[in-house]
């Protein structure tokens, strides 16, 4: 029987918590950022979320109206100049009879300056700058795994079905990545030139 990815995700987080792993936030891309998922995560795992949201027809309760993100964006004045974000609004997520307050922050898309991206957080006390900074960590993790898969043979080099062999392979690939990161930093970071600025 196939299970929904969102149900499996909730199970994985609950099992991680059961063995003592903790985190401040769960970071998602837009795939998992539906109001239903965010509310379920808060209810079942008692964790706040920071996620990218899709510009689709998903409705958020904003100033007494059910609006999608494009409608919320067009209804509000944007911050001008070199601000880190364009818009920040508080909304309410709805699922059946349940409601959860959240904050949506819209930022410029770095790859297309005329476009914008929307981030959501269920921690309404989190500042806009901190929300953007924390979500940026998720992108660093994506780049890390893409590099490991594409260049360091994380997926293709080891064909074993032994747990120990797979674990050793992952450790070797991650060590390769760390060595390359240190070499890159030493070659590119001005602070490391001739050991002058340590």
In which residue ranges do the predicted regions lie?
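Single, function-defining residue in the core of a domain
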Residues: 1-198
């Amino acid at each position: 029987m196939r299970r929904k990815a969102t149900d499996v995700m909730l199970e994985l987080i609950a099992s991680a918590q059961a063995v003592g792993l903790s985190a401040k936030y769960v970071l998602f891309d837009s795939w998992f950022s539906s109001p239903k998922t965010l509310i379920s995560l808060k209810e079942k795992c008692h964790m706040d979320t920071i996620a990218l949201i899709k510009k689709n027809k998903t409705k958020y309760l904003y100033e007494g109206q059910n609006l999608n993100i494009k409608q919320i964006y067009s209804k509000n004045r944007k911050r001008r100049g070199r601000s880190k974000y364009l818009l920040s609004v508080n909304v309410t997520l709805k699922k059946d009879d349940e409601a959860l307050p959240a904050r949506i922050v819209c930022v410029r898309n770095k790859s297309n300056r005329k476009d914008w991206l929307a981030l959501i957080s269920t921690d309404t006390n989190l500042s806009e700058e901190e929300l953007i900074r924390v979500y940026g960590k998720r992108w660093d993790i994506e780049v890390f795994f893409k590099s490991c898969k594409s260049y360091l043979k994380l997926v293709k080099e080891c064909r074993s079905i032994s747990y120990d062999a797979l674990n050793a392979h992952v450790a070797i690939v991650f060590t390769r990545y760390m060595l390359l990161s240190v070499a890159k930093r030493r070659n590119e970071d001005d602070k490391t030139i001739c050991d002058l600025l340590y």
